[in-house]
Curated annotation (Swiss-Prot):
GO cellular component terms attached to this protein's record: extracellular region
CDD domains in the record: GDPD_like_SMaseD_PLD
Binding site for Mg(2+): 24, 26, 84
Family of this protein: Belongs to the arthropod phospholipase D family. Class II subfamily.
Active site, UniProt feature: 40 (nucleophile)
Organism: Loxosceles spinulosa
GO molecular function, one term: toxin activity
Name of this chain's protein: Dermonecrotic toxin LspiSicTox-betaIE4i
Cofactor(s) for this UniProt protein: Mg(2+)
Domain of life: Eukaryota
Role noted for this protein: Dermonecrotic toxins cleave the phosphodiester linkage between the phosphate and headgroup of certain phospholipids (sphingolipid and lysolipid substrates), forming an alcohol (often choline) and a cyclic phosphate. This toxin acts on sphingomyelin (SM). It may also act on ceramide phosphoethanolamine (CPE), lysophosphatidylcholine (LPC) and lysophosphatidylethanolamine (LPE), but not on lysophosphatidylserine (LPS), and lysophosphatidylglycerol (LPG). It acts by transphosphatidylation, releasing exclusively cyclic phosphate products as second products.
Catalysed reaction equations from the record: an N-(acyl)-sphingosylphosphocholine = an N-(acyl)-sphingosyl-1,3-cyclic phosphate + choline; an N-(acyl)-sphingosylphosphoethanolamine = an N-(acyl)-sphingosyl-1,3-cyclic phosphate + ethanolamine; a 1-acyl-sn-glycero-3-phosphocholine = a 1-acyl-sn-glycero-2,3-cyclic phosphate + choline; a 1-acyl-sn-glycero-3-phosphoethanolamine = a 1-acyl-sn-glycero-2,3-cyclic phosphate + ethanolamine
Source lineage: Eukaryota, Metazoa, Ecdysozoa, Arthropoda, Chelicerata
Length: 275
């Protein structure tokens, strides 16, 4: 599960204390494409404080401490970090610069030379038209000799678009693994209105033998038991929520615990699950 809008240290500690094994953080950029802060702003999900923020370098360093075995701050349950990139309005040049600079920031502040920090990252881009960000991000990792860290990186587009079109974009980027697909809407709108047709399509596509362009499917934002149970029934790999402890309680109910559990570090977030 992913705790949503984890944009400062206080809320990060709170969610980890609740038992979350994944977090989603919002990353803002300057007009030139420089990664600057964790910040969502208004509007955001209902019943949430939208203005939490911390500098990107400081945030990545803190995540590094939390996910490095042997560090006094190490939190064993934190496995996956979704970086929800706020790229709206950036030019293609700025997108290219943004991908390059985010790779640099991860190398400088998260892996910091020793590469012992063990979290996986999902680079979550809003629109397929912003795919240049992914291209330069991957290229820069190679050029700064952090290409081996690609094993810890996955990708996701969050525009709820036609996945056949999304597949073409991935093909153009040369990406055919470590792909997460998502479907969702703000918690202010009931799941009943959103429906689950697209989510069902994604899980069906994921499970097609030999299909390479979806490894995992997650749903957002699921804050009610009926929604979480529906997601489990559809076979999703993860849910984003504002209430991590609540989702864990649902998972631990006898009717679910025999079939589902929270992922641990022994599970690979880029491998398809087979029952």
């Amino acid at each position: 599960e992913f705790a949503l809008m984890v944009n400062d240290f206080e809320i990060l500690k709170s969610y980890l204390d609740e038992g979350a094994n994944g977090i989603e953080s919002d990353i803002t950029f300057s007009d030139e494409g420089e990664p600057e802060y964790t910040f969502h702003g208004v509007p955001c999900d209902c019943r949430r404080w939208c203005d939490r923020s911390v500098g990107i370098g400081e945030y990545l360093q803190h995540l590094s401490d939390l996910t490095t075995p042997g560090n006094p701050k190490f939190r064993e349950n934190l496995l996956v970090v979704v970086l929800d990139l706020k790229l709206n309005g950036l030019s293609q040049d700025a997108l290219r610069q943004g991908g390059l600079r985010l790779a640099d920031k991860l190398a400088a502040h998260y892996w910091t030379g020793n590469r012992k920090a063990r979290a996986y990252f999902i680079i979550s881009v809003p629109k397929t038209s912003e795919s240049e960000f992914m291209r330069t991000f991957r290229k820069e990792l190679d050029e700064i000799n952090f290409g081996d860290m690609s094993a810890k990186i996955g990708f996701d587009f969050t525009d709820n678009g036609d996945f056949k079109e999304t597949q073409k974009v991935y093909e153009g980027l040369g990406i055919s693994e470590h792909i997460w697909a998502s479907d969702g809407i703000t918690n202010c709108i009931p799941l009943l209105l959103r429906g689950t047709d697209r989510l069902e399509d994604l899980t069906r596509q994921r499970d097609e033998p030999g299909y390479k362009y979806i490894d995992k499917v997650y749903a957002w934002t699921y804050d009610k038991e009926t929604s979480v149970v529906k997601a489990l029934e559809l076979g999703v790999d993860g849910v984003m929520t504002n209430y991590a402890d609540f989702v864990i309680k649902v998972l631990n109910k006898p009717e679910h615990s025999s079939k589902y559990r929270l992922a641990t570090y022994d599970d690979n977030p880029f491998e398809k699950f087979t029952a």
